């Protein structure tokens, strides 16, 4: 819709430019004619001896006045057209801004959809429960130790604690293995296509806008994306990230590609 409106406005602008150019050409022609009339008037007014010469001088005067009036009319029309041209220019600029906003929103939407389709966040969801389990394990251990100190039957409570620790460690080990297997699972052809689509969207998006989304991904995944785009663009994205996050991602990037050189304009 915006494109069609902009094209119509641009055609109107071109037509105004054409009309203004025609007026300027006509204005130059009239100014040249006025100069000739003024020179002729000066020449003839030097010696006016007959009635016929007086009439000729009046005729030249009338032509000068008509030319001056015509020039004033042209100037008014020219200013009106210039004003319309500036208005159109402002309207076109506004439409271009709206087009750019729409384009950016589309890119953001494509990236969001691609991220969902690839399921990158499922790794984060896998990692979070492991952390919760780890901390709950620490807290439960601390509470049990306190109970053991206050308890009469230390031996029995100690057995309970050992069993609890073993169960927690076993669950942690299972989660660790699942996470490692998930990370090592190769992408399917469909996932590869979706990844390529995401990378194209990242390349089109402004670095300052896409950086927050990339830095919130697991560092390895963020590194995989940045390794697949141009180094200059990757450098711009890293420059707009939290320094600590950027440093973590760079470690993975350099492990994969030691010669990586992120250039920032």
Curated annotation (Swiss-Prot):
It comes from the Bacteria. Gene3D superfamilies: 1.10.220.30. Keywords: Coiled coil. Residues 143-205 form a coiled coil. This is Uncharacterized protein aq_1680. It comes from Aquifex aeolicus (strain VF5).
